[in-house]
C-alpha cells in the first residue's frame, strides 16, 4: 500500500487514531514528518503556475496530533505543554556544526517545530515556525511573524 493510501485510509477512520495506533501508521506519519523536515516533501507547492495542496501530507500532520500524547517540558525560564513529537523542536540538541551545516540563522525566541523546512541563508527573527512550514533559501521571517 502506498504512503498516500495509508494516510487516506487512516484519515477516513481518524476518530480511531490514537497513541495506540499500529506501528505502520506511526512509521508512515513519522517518515512524512522527517521528509517535511528536510524539504523532501511539502504540504503545498506551485506546480505549473498553480498552487497544489498535497492533501495526504496535510492529513499526516493532523493525524500526528492524534497519535501523540501531551507532555511537559521544563526549561530554565518557562515550561511548555505540547504534543510529545513536537515538544523539543527541530534544532533541539544541535551543535554549532549542525547549525552551520543547516546554513540558516535563528535568533533567540525563534522556535522551529520539527517537520518544518528552513532553507540556507534564511534568517529567523523572533518568530514561530510551525510544522509543515517551508521557508525557502534566503527568506527572512521578521519579528513576531
Give, region by region, the residue ranges found by the protein language model.
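Structural signal for interior beta-strand "rungs" in well-ordered beta-sheet cores
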Residues: 100, 104-145
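Terminal amphipathic alpha-helical/low-complexity segments used for targeting or macromolecular assembly
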Residues: 1-104
Amino acid at each position: 500500500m502506498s504512503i498516500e493510501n495509508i494516510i487516506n485510509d487512516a484519515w477516513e477512520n481518524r476518530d480511531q487514531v490514537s497513541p495506540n495506533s499500529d506501528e505502520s501508521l506511526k512509521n508512515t506519519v513519522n517518515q512524512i514528518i522527517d521528509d517535511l523536515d528536510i524539504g523532501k516533501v511539502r504540504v503545498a507547492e506551485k506546480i505549473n503556475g498553480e498552487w497544489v495542496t498535497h492533501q495526504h501530507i496535510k492529513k499526516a500532520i493532523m493525524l500526528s496530533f492524534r497519535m501523540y500524547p501531551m507532555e511537559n517540558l521544563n526549561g530554565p525560564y518557562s515550561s511548555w505543554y505540547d504534543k510529545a513529537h513536537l515538544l523539543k523542536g527541530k534544532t533541539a540538541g544541535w551543535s554549532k556544526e549542525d547549525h552551520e551545516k543547516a546554513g540558516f540563522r535563528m535568533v533567540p525566541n525563534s522556535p522551529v517545530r520539527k517537520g518544518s523546512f528552513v532553507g540556507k541563508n534564511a534568517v529567523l527573527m523572533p518568530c514561530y515556525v510551525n510544522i509543515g512550514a517551508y521557508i525557502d533559501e534566503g527568506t527572512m521571517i521578521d519579528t513576531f511573524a
